[in-house]
UniProtKB/Swiss-Prot annotation:
Disordered as annotated region, ranges: 1-23
Organism field: Hordeum vulgare (Barley)
Sequence similarity: Belongs to the protease inhibitor I13 (potato type I serine protease inhibitor) family.
Name of the protein this chain belongs to: Subtilisin-chymotrypsin inhibitor-2A
GO MF entries: serine-type endopeptidase inhibitor activity
Site (Reactive bond): residue numbering on this chain: 60-61
Cysteine disulfide links: none
GO biological process, one term: response to wounding
Function summary: Inhibits both subtilisin and chymotrypsin.
Keywords: Protease inhibitor, Serine protease inhibitor
């Protein structure tokens, strides 16, 4: 019998994730901005949440305190929100 635990969906346990915190939220695609913000801030209270239209060009620097929400024309989450 194996004692290896499965990695929960949406949790990054790799390099750069020193505290084993959730780094992406695939379950939020299609949800409203307000609902997404609420869930993300429960998981990552220090997150700086940036809301942008889907397709917006953004800088590539990685920030552990930032989560970008890309939204469609109805202000629903269009892409998986991720730390960065």
């Amino acid at each position: 019998m194996s004692s290896v635990e499965k990695k929960p969906e949406g949790v990054n346990t790799g390099a750069g994730d020193r505290h084993n915190l959730k780094t992406e939220w695939p379950e939020l695609v299609g949800k409203s901005v307000e609902e997404a913000k609420k869930v993300i801030l429960q998981d990552k209270p220090e997150a700086q949440i940036i809301v942008l239209p889907v397709g917006t060009i953004v800088t590539m620097e990685y920030r552990i305190d930032r989560v970008r929400l890309f939204v469609d024309k109805l202000d629903n989450i269009a892409q998986v929100p991720r730390v960065g």
